[in-house]
Amino acid sequence: MSEKLPTEAAVTAAGEADSKTIEPVHGVHKPKYDWMGLTNEWGVRVKPGIHGLRLGDLNVGIYGEIPEFWEDQTRRPRGALSRPGIPPLPYSLRYKHEMWADCAADLYEEAIQRRWIPATEVPWDSLEVLPDDVERAVCQICTELSQCANTELEIIAYWQDRMSYGYFEVKQFLATVTFDCARHMEVLRKRALSNGGGLGIESRGRVNRMILESSGGWTEAVVYLYLMRGTYITRLLTGLLSSAHNDAESFIYSHMLEDHARHLTYGYDHLKYAATHRKGSTAIMRTLLTIGEGHMADELKDGVVRSAMAIIFGGGIEGGRTRGMKRYLLLVREFLEDYLALCRWLGIDREETLHPMLKSYLED
């Protein structure tokens, strides 16, 4: 017969002991279990699908009821039982139309699955020496896009804290966007400092300031952040990808485009939801765009992106003055065509009222 180890004997003895003979620990209150059974809905068994157990799969029963107005001003998870007496928190965005997009849960899952690591996944050893003017142009664009990513991160962080917990799908997705932005800042800085160049000059930041100062509401910020600036950045990244000088740049721009596409999908979907669920929202968007188009026109005319992109497209300063600038102007035209099409989709016709400086890009 095998002999029990000392530890096994101790466990057995403890298990066989009568719990009534155990002395209570001095100063520790007897635990209460009156919280057990307090629930809005019990017995839920959500099963994983072919893609696993996804965030959107959990919207069943009471847990899937998403009200148009979230009355609770605490951090109570949606579907949990509320507790009386909890002091309110300053959640100023409590209407669904102020932040909602039906795609938020799916975009969250996609963002988690497609995260990438600049430190080890970018093929940095593919970088080769470029002509000085081209390297300077690439580094200037990295500087500019890094500022844009920082602006996106800051405005999201500002509004995310004001969004009610009842719409957690949006809050969770936007958390991934801030991480995307941080990753973009990281990889752009690494590209600028890894091939004999350096960071360029800070931009005037007219549109950045416009985005950061859009304090009327999250929807208003999204108009500037995604409908206007984001649509333009998509065209920039597409142009950079088509003109990448090496595998490292191809990896960077293609992965930034994937991330950016998620951001825009949420932004466009949210604006559509607001336009169809909030009376007068399209009129507000129209006013915002009238103001924003002026800042965008100034930045397109005077910003350093214009000449830097022309140099990249033209393979240098000489080529930038001709074919490079021609290609950049085509990029701006394509951006404006995208922008006007999106405005029509939202029910905001900007064809006739487009800012004259922007309209000139369509007439050339």
Predicted segments with their positions:
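Terminal targeting/low-complexity segments that flank the catalytic cores of oxidoreductases
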Residues: S2-K171, G198, E220, R278-D364
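Short loop-to-helix capping motifs
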Residues: G166-Y167, H245-D247
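Long, hydrophobic, well-ordered secondary-structure blocks that form the structural core
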Residues: E152-S214
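All-alpha helical catalytic cores of prenyl diphosphate-utilizing isoprenoid enzymes
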Residues: R191-R206, S215-G239
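Alpha-helical transition-metal enzyme core signature, strongest for iron centers
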Residues: L145-L153, L174-A192, V223-T234, M256-G267, ...
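Active-site loop segments of alpha/beta catalytic cores
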Residues: L212, A221, A244, S250-F251
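Extended amphipathic alpha-helical segments with heptad-repeat/coiled-coil character used for oligomerization
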Residues: S214-S215, G230, A244, Y268-T290
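Short, charged, amphipathic alpha-helical segments
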Residues: K171-A175, F251-S254, A283
